[in-house]
Amino acid sequence: MSTTWFVGADWLAEHIDDPEIQIIDARMASPGQEDRNVAQEYLNGHIPGAVFFDIEALSDHTSPLPHMLPRPETFAVAMRELGVNQDKHLIVYDEGNLFSAPRAWWMLRTFGVEKVSILGGELAGWQRDDLLLEEGAVELPEGEFNAAFNPEAVVKVTDVLLASHENTAQIIDARPATRFNAEVDEPRPGLRRGHIPGALNVPWTELVREGELKTTDELDAIFFGRGVSYDKPIIVSCGSGVTAAVVLLALATLDVPNVKLYDGAWSEWGARADLPVEPEK
């Protein structure tokens, strides 16, 4: 990879006027935060020059599932309208917890962008360094973006069912342990408790510290401690396909090959009574 996974706030502040740099604000409300107006939060203050990458709006609205990838041409049109150029170095951030920036990073990579980095420390780190924010929308000329979709990046429910039944790939679930273990209800209504049979639980929050991934040694210890093997194909899942990207990013930084994301995630699996669930009632 020609770009670093993360860039620092000091580096971005120094290069913020570089014409080859574009900044993308990918903050997002999590389930249970429906009262948040994230678009207004962006307008109230964002890193100068950053356009708003609305993951909710950039999902496939023809699907009943919350965050399925849009069609490549739909994504390309949206990026051109934002002024995003696929040949530039895109810097993505969220509000500070590394919740949604990895999903934006993964989407851009899956649609063919080669140079994408995440701002280490995110917006919170930028503000801790007393760096300036800008208010209002950012209007850019139409971007040049032709989506080149990578079908190897994502799997469907049938692939996951086969992996679960035949043990052809490891399934990593990024949800909190209480949800994985069926101890609490899902935040989205109508979903069963539990997890995909055979899945391993690696909560995404355990991989993150202050808007950045933990060290390589710490990540290795977490994955190995949960029974993950880097030598076997991996499918990452979560509640709706967002925080699974945190796990995918962590594995990418460790040079783990053959990792794919299950876009339907528990929003799909947990809604279907015909699919098996652990623990069984």
Set out the residue ranges of the language-model regions:
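Cytosolic catalytic domains that perform sulfur/thiol-centered chemistry
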Residues: 1-281
